[in-house]
Structure formats: structure tokens, C-alpha cells
């Protein structure tokens, strides 16, 4: 994850998305059949489980099951191994998906910059393979 810091400060920061901001491109851009991610746990369920705001993500329903299991089988902490595994695996998949979205955003920003540069060159009259008349003389 630290590679984005190197690219952001030492490379071209204009094509590096901000990891704390929402993506600028629509999620279905290039993927017409792509489904939007939906929360499984409702706001009321998360409030009833007293989840902190940092833990209210797409894996909150697994965390609610884990906390309920821990509460129901209190002295036996090893009884909730499967619930813990499910929550950890969901968090891992969510992390990987967010990193893929970050990379997708970065590549789309690079593509946008290349297209703008090409359009600016064509507006000047310097397309690919063309020579400026001043240079030709």
C-alpha cells in the first residue's frame, strides 16, 4: 500500500488519486453489467450492535455475528473460530477490492491525461506524423 505514497510525492501527482476521497469515475464505467455494492447489515442492526463508526463497513454483518457468538459463548473463546475467519476473510476481500478500485482510478486518470494531451496536440495542428510548418522550413 505504500507504493501510492512514492508515486504521489515523487511521480506525477495529477494522475494519482487521493485514497481518502471517493472515486471520480462512475463505478460502471467500462462495465455495463457491474452491480453496485450493497450493505447487508442495516443501519438499525449496526446501531443495535453498538458498532463504532470505523467498523461499519461492508463486512459489518459478519462482525455482528462474531460479537453475538462471543457474547453467547463467553468463557469458551475458541467457539467462534469460524465467525472470526468469515469476518477476517470478508475484510481481506474488501481490502483487495478497494485496492483494485484505487488502481482502476489511477489508470483511468492516466488515460484521461493522455487523451487530453493528444487532443491538445491535435488542436495545435500537430497530429501524429505531422510536422509543424515552421520546423519543416
From Swiss-Prot:
Keyword Disulfide bond: yes
Pfam hit, one: NDUF_B7
UniProt subcellular location: Mitochondrion inner membrane; Mitochondrion intermembrane space
Major subcellular site: mitochondrion
Chain location of the short sequence motif Cx9C motif 1 per the record: 59-69
Modified residues (Phosphoserine): 73
Residue positions bearing lipid (N-myristoyl glycine): 2
Coiled-coil stretches: none
Domain called CHCH: residue spans: 56-98
Keyword annotations: Disulfide bond, Electron transport, Lipoprotein, Membrane, Mitochondrion, Mitochondrion inner membrane, Myristate, Phosphoprotein, Respiratory chain, Transport
Record motif Cx9C motif 2, residues: 80-90
Record note on domains: Contains two C-X9-C motifs that are predicted to form a helix-coil-helix structure, permitting the formation of intramolecular disulfide bonds.
Subunit note: Complex I is composed of 45 different subunits.
The protein's name: NADH dehydrogenase [ubiquinone] 1 beta subcomplex subunit 7
Amino acid at each position: 500500500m505504500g507504493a501510492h505514497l512514492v508515486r504521489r510525492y515523487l511521480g506525477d501527482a495529477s494522475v494519482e488519486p487521493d485514497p481518502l476521497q471517493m472515486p471520480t469515475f462512475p463505478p460502471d464505467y467500462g462495465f455495463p453489467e457491474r452491480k453496485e455494492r450493497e450493505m447487508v447489515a442495516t443501519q438499525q442492526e449496526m446501531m443495535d450492535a453498538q458498532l463504532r463508526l470505523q467498523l461499519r463497513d461492508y463486512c459489518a454483518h459478519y462482525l455482528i455475528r462474531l460479537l453475538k457468538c462471543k457474547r453467547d459463548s463467553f468463557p469458551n473463546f475458541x467457539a467462534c473460530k469460524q465467525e472470526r475467519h468469515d469476518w477476517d476473510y470478508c475484510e481481506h476481500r474488501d481490502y483487495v477490492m478497494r485496492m483494485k478500485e484505487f488502481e482502476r482510478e489511477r489508470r483511468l486518470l492516466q488515460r484521461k491525461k493522455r487523451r487530453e494531451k493528444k487532443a491538445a496536440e491535435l488542436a495545435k495542428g500537430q497530429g501524429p506524423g505531422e510536422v509543424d510548418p515552421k520546423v519543416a522550413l
